[in-house]
C-alpha cells in the first residue's frame, strides 16, 4: 500500500489519513508534536517525529529498544530532541557559522511526501521532505530539496538522505546521522571496526591520533571523528550487537558526554550518560559539494539480530 502527495501534508490531513495507510500511523506525540509510527508485520516498530524528521525509537521484532532517548528531552518547536537519530544538516557541530548541527534537526517544516508497505515480510517506508524557505535562506542562502527516507524491516532500520541542489550555485555542507545507540552500561560497550584509522580527538582540541584498539571502549567523555572509516562497524555490549552499515558517508563520530559534563546538560536525565553511545555516520572532516541540478544520496542501515546477547571481545 502506498500514499503519495507531491505537496506534502499538514497535521490535520495526516491525522485523517492515518487510518488508511496501514503500517504507518500518524498521530500526536509528546509536546503535541506530530509523530509517525511504523509497524512491520514481524512486530518491529519505529517512531519518527516530523519535527526535525527525528527517529526516536527503533525496536526490531524482539521488541527491545535499540535507540536511546533522554527522559529529560524537550519536545517543543525550535528545540532539538536529545537522543534517537538527529539529522545534522547543513552543518555538523560548530564547524561553521550556523547554529550547532544546522537547522534540519529543529525544523518544523518537514512534510510527509509518501508512505508505503510491501506486505508480509517486506518493508515499511516513510519519506519526509524539507525545502528551502525564507528562514533557511536567511542563514544558509541556497535553494535545496532534502528527502529523508526511513525504512523499517524485521531486524533493521535504514535512514537515507537525498539532497538536490535546486539553485544555481554549488552547495557545500557537512552532515551526520547523529545516532544514539542504547547500551545497558557504556563502560561495558565496545565498537569494532575502527582499528588503524586516523581520528581527531575533540576533547584535546582536535589532536590527531591513530586508533590502535581492535575493540574501542569508552570509560568517560569521548568525542572523536574517525576519518575515512569503513562502511561496516559493530557495537558490542551486554545485549544483542548492533551493526552499522553506512553509504556514501566517509567519516564516523564516536561521542559520549561523560559523567562530568552530563550534570550541566539540562535535557539529559541523571545518570543517563551511561546508557548510550553515539556512533554517527557523517561527512565531517571535509565538506561535501553538490553542483546545481545534481543530487547527493547517502545513508545508513542499523541491523541487530534477535539472538542471545553478545559480549564485548
Show the residue positions of the predicted features:
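Beta-strand-rich recognition/accessory modules
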Residues: 11-44, 51, 61, 131-136, ...
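Extended, loop-rich substrate-binding clefts of extracytoplasmic carbohydrate-active enzymes
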Residues: 25, 30, 99-154
Amino acid at each position: 500500500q502506498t500514499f503519495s502527495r507531491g505537496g506534502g501534508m499538514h497535521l490535520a490531513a495526516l491525522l485523517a489519513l492515518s487510518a488508511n495507510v496501514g503500517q504507518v500511523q500518524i498521530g500526536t506525540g509528546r509536546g503535541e508534536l506530530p509523530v509517525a509510527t511504523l509497524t512491520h508485520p514481524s512486530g518491529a516498530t519505529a517512531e519518527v517525529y516530523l519535527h526535525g524528521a527525528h527517529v526516536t525509537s527503533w525496536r526490531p521484532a524482539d521488541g527491545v529498544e535499540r535507540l536511546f532517548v533522554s527522559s529529560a528531552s524537550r519536545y517543543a518547536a525550535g528545540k532539538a530532541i536529545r537522543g534517537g537519530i538527529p539529522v545534522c544538516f547543513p552543518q555538523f557541530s560548530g564547524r561553521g557559522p550556523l547554529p550547532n548541527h544546522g537547522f534540519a534537526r529543529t525544523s518544523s517544516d518537514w512534510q510527509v511526501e509518501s508512505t508505503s508497505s510491501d506486505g508480509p515480510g517486506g518493508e515499511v517506508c516513510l519519506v519526509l521532505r524539507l525545502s528551502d524557505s525564507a528562514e533557511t535562506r536567511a542563514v544558509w542562502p541556497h535553494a535545496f530539496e532534502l528527502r529523508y527516507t526511513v525504512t523499517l524491516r524485521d531486524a533493521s532500520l535504514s535512514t537515507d538522505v537525498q539532497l538536490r541542489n535546486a539553485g544555481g550555485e554549488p552547495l557545500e555542507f557537512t552532515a551526520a546521522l547523529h545516532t544514539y545507540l542504547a547500551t545497558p552500561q557504556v563502560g561495558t560497550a565496545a565498537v569494532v571496526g575502527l582499528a588503524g584509522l586516523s581520528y581527531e580527538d575533540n576533547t584535546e582540541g582536535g589532536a590527531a591520533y591513530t586508533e590502535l584498539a581492535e575493540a574501542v571502549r569508552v570509560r568517560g567523555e569521548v568525542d572523536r571523528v574517525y576519518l575515512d572509516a569503513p562502511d561496516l562497524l559493530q557495537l558490542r555490549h551486554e545485549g544483542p550487537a548492533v551493526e552499522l552499515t553506512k553509504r556514501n558517508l566517509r567519516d564516523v563520530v564516536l561521542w559520549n558526554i561523560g559523567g562530568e559534563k552530563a550534570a550541566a546538560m539540562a535535557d539529559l536525565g541523571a545518570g543517563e550518560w551511561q546508557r548510550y553511545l553515539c556512533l554517527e555516520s557523517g561527512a565531517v572532516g571535509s565538506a561535501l559539494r553538490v553542483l546545481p541540478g545534481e543530487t547527493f544520496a547517502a545513508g545508513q542501515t542499523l541491523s541487530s539480530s534477535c539472538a542471545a546477547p553478545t559480549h564485548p571481545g
